[in-house]
Every structure is written in C-alpha cells, then in structure tokens.
Amino acid sequence: MKTGVKKLKVHVKKNDMVTVISGNDKGKSGKVLRVYPVKGRVIVEGVNIRKRHMRPTQSSPQGQIIEREFPVHASNVKKG
C-alpha cells in the first residue's frame, strides 16, 4: 500500500507568463502567482476572478466583499 499524495507534473512555474486556452476566461493572459502541483492547478493574475464574502471582524465591523483570483486547471493554460 502506498502512502502520501501523488504530485502531478505541472508544465508552468511561478512568474511564468501564460494564456488561458479554454473556459470562460479563454484568451486572457497573465503571470502565474502560485502553483498547486498536488491538485494540478495554478492561480493566474487577473484570471478566474470571483467574489469572496468576508466575515465581520474587529478591523472591519461590517465585513466586506473582495474580488480575488481562484485556481484554474493547469491543462487549461499554455506558456506564452
């Protein structure tokens, strides 16, 4: 029985310039901010932006809605 998690080979690295080749953001390009080799996903600057609702805290008592990049699958991006 094997233990541990298998990492997938991801063809891009942090700070590479990539272009999205499929999905809602097809044709957009940006810099890779982070790579998740275990899940085979990457976060690309300015791509797959979603709204995230943040709870109220002492620093922001009303809470807030922030927009941030979410991961896309590595097979949906190409270098260049």
From Swiss-Prot:
InterPro entries: KOW, Rib_uL2_dom2, Ribosomal_uL24, Ribosomal_uL24_CS, Ribosomal_uL24_KOW, Translation_prot_SH3-like_sf. It comes from the Bacteria. The keyword Acetylation does not apply. One of its GO terms (molecular function) is rRNA binding. Keywords: Ribonucleoprotein, Ribosomal protein, RNA-binding, rRNA-binding. GO terms for biological process: translation. Belongs to the universal ribosomal protein uL24 family. Part of the 50S ribosomal subunit. One of two assembly initiator proteins, it binds directly to the 5'-end of the 23S rRNA, where it nucleates assembly of the 50S subunit. This is Large ribosomal subunit protein uL24. It comes from Chlorobium phaeovibrioides (strain DSM 265 / 1930). The lineage of its organism: Bacteria, Pseudomonadati, Chlorobiota, Chlorobiia, Chlorobiales. The gene is rplX.
